[in-house]
Amino acid sequence: MKPSREVIRAETSAIPIRLLGVPDVVAVPHSVVLTARAVNQPSRVKDFISLTKPEVLFLVVVATGVGCVMASKSLDLLTLMHALIGTALVAGGTAALNHYIERASDSLMRRTAGRPLPSGRLKPNEVLMFGIGLSLKGIVYLAFTLNLLTGLIGLTALLSYLLLYTPLKRRSRLCTLVGAFPGAAPVLMGWAAVRGDLGPEAWVLFAILFLWQFPHFLAIGWMYREDYTRAGMLMIPDAKEGPDVNEDSGRMTFSLIRRTAQALVVVSFLPVLMGMTSGVYLCSALLLGLSLLYVVNGATSDRSGVAAKHLLHATVIYLPLLFLFLVLCRTDVVAGWPL
């Protein structure tokens, strides 16, 4: 006995197709259609996580931890935990709000067009509330579990990033300079979480992270200069030169990369001069610095997208290793060493 048409309509979803130019109908169960859609559509949870920019968030957490450790004579793990959680909440919320503000620009760039907002997977109001919620929770968390100064630094970093750096991307080539201030705030937050103030040593850590951002983000700006130009963003000094590399193209960008990298290497020696670390760190910082400058010089000579990518990778390797040696070679840790 054949099932009636009513039964077929109730249990299946008819999807029209064409085979050899002849219209036809294929009956596909609703469960199959829904399953296929679920498989093809990225998870909403994954999309919300991506709004926090996990790769950047990792470096933020590392920098905060370094600030905590360098400020501590005997590290309180509870304080460290509060600092990491609070800073991660603020940074993640700031990143989500940045996604919301730049959703129109992101839709114009190839590398960002697939993000949750430009692709339509998430609604703007969802992202806005998510970003506000994370940010406020982070600031309040830092202020109540640690101290008011740490919360204020987090609030200042959030506001300067969203209200100064983000709009300046479309108006001024100084945006990278302005953005480097909130970008270096995590080490101050880590230090303030432990000490409740900001001594000279905290500003040395700040200077290291501040200068590191120039070769790092200018390399990204050069790699994706065509995308940024399409979106009207002035991320590099040579922003109006376009995507083609010629004899003069990138001269200002790579000159700034070279100078800030040189300054970074010099500033990286200051922890030794201030008695924060031992001579072992000095040797490590020198070796890392020379390696970074070698890559910078190669990129400056080449000025290609591939060279900029190598530089980007070098900066990503340089900073965590420098911080690692900084923490391992603290003077209180190696007080008994001959160095």
Q: What do the predicted segments below correspond to?
A:
Residues 124, 128-194:
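Intramembrane alpha-helical segments
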Residues 293-321:
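Interfacial loop-to-transmembrane junctions
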